[in-house]
């Protein structure tokens, strides 16, 4: 997907500065022995077989970006695709989608509290936007 390696590093560095252990995770086939080693905690959950982008402590985060040009529906799609991979999502909001619109997209897609955290990547940094059912 369109998230660059530089953005992954910036996002990983943000969590590392908070004292978290961060690991960029590779894409591996579910039947390979590496999958169980890397993503073992996902086995038996709705995310089994998925390969989120980053592990922060014991949480797996999925980064969602977009291909230009920016359109409103892209933030909806980023949330929808992100929640298919992990309940912890980082959205590329470099084009400055409004908080109101992103909030509405989360509420519409947060069935059974499937979304635990949403971070927004803006201006080279991360901002916590949603956590455990509450907007920040």
Which residues does each predicted region cover?
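Metal-dependent nuclease catalytic core centered on acidic motifs
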Residues: 1-40, 45, 66-136
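Conserved catalytic cores of phosphodiester-cleaving nucleases, focusing on short active-site segments
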Residues: 54-67
């Amino acid at each position: 997907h369109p998230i660059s390696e530089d953005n992954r590093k910036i996002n990983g560095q943000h969590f590392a500065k908070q004292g978290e252990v961060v690991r960029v995770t590779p894409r591996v086939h579910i039947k390979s022995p590496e999958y169980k080693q890397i993503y073992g905690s996902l086995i038996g959950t709705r995310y089994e077989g998925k390969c989120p982008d980053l592990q922060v402590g014991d949480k797996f985060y999925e980064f969602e970006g977009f291909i230009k040009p920016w359109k409103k529906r892209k933030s909806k799609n980023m949330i929808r695709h992100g929640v298919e991979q992990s309940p912890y999502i980082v959205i590329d909001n470099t084009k400055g989608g409004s908080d109101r619109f992103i909030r509405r997209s989360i509420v519409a897609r947060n069935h059974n509290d499937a979304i635990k955290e949403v971070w927004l990547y803006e201006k080279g940094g991360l901002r916590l936007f949603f956590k455990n059912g509450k907007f920040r």
